């Protein structure tokens, strides 16, 4: 199969498009044919070498696809299911996982950083890393939100316990994490103050429903006024 793999860190020229073996699934795994893979800022950090990953590595954390093969112990999915990939790797058995704090798992990892990721034609995954994709969502849209969306949800809902009476400041609201945070906060009925670094980014935050928008390069002093 084809995949994008890193053998060294650097600029875009280090991204190698090549043939690699098709993954063989274990008895508790699922083989997914990738239909869409999104670019996350994490991919840029990994390409540049910031996380210090082991090489070679197939990059990519976010993706969506179709189930093509099932391990003999898998009973929660069927061949042909359209799925969204959860890039967070966790054991499911430690105390953190049992408390639904998978991001604090003792063996926590991320696809495309600690193991081969989604920039390939096929990927072998545990069922806990798959979510059925609603038919109303395209593969491209489904691939765009797992890492950024989960990060925002974890911060606002699981940790901050977001409630309707809250006023939420979303810094850099047009970023991946920021745009999902803005939408999640509005979904919970919160008042949202958003910041952006340009006119276009502020306009994007407005389209997502921000109640008040500040250019964080020139208007941050207004925050003191808002707190009075």
Show where each model-derived region lies:
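Residues forming the Rossmann-fold NAD(P)(H) cofactor-binding site
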Residues: 179
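Adenosine-nucleotide cofactor-binding segment
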Residues: 170, 186-228
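N-terminal Rossmann NAD(P)H-binding glycine-rich loop of SDR-like oxidoreductase domains
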Residues: 174, 182
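Nucleotide donor/acceptor-binding cores
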Residues: 1, 165-167, 191
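Glycine-rich beta-strand-centered segment in the early N-terminal region that forms part
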Residues: 21-38, 50-98, 134-136
């Amino acid at each position: 199969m084809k995949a994008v793999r890193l053998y060294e860190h650097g600029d875009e020229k280090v991204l190698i498009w090549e043939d690699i073996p098709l993954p063989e699934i274990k008895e508790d795994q699922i083989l997914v044919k990738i239909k869409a893979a999104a670019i996350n800022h994490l991919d840029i950090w990994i390409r540049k070498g910031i996380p210090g990953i082991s090489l070679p590595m197939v990059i990519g954390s976010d993706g969506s696809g179709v189930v093509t093969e099932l391990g003999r112990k898998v009973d929660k999915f069927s061949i042909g299911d359209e799925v969204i990939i959860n890039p967070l790797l966790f054991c499911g058995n430690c105390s953190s996982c049992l408390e639904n704090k998978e991001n604090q798992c003792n063996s926590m990892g991320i696809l495309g950083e600690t193991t081969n990721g989604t920039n390939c034609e096929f990927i072998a995954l545990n069922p806990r890393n798959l979510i059925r994709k609603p038919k109303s969502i395209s593969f491209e849209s489904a691939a765009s939100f797992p890492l950024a969306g989960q990060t925002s949800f974890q911060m606002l809902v699981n940790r901050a316990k977001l409630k309707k009476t809250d006023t939420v400041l979303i810094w850099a609201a047009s970023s991946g994490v920021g745009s999902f945070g803005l939408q999640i906060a509005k979904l919970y009925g919160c008042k949202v103050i958003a910041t952006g670094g340009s006119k276009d980014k502020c306009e994007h935050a407005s389209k997502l429903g921000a109640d008040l928008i500040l250019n964080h390069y020139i208007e941050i002093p207004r925050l003191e006024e808002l707190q009075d």
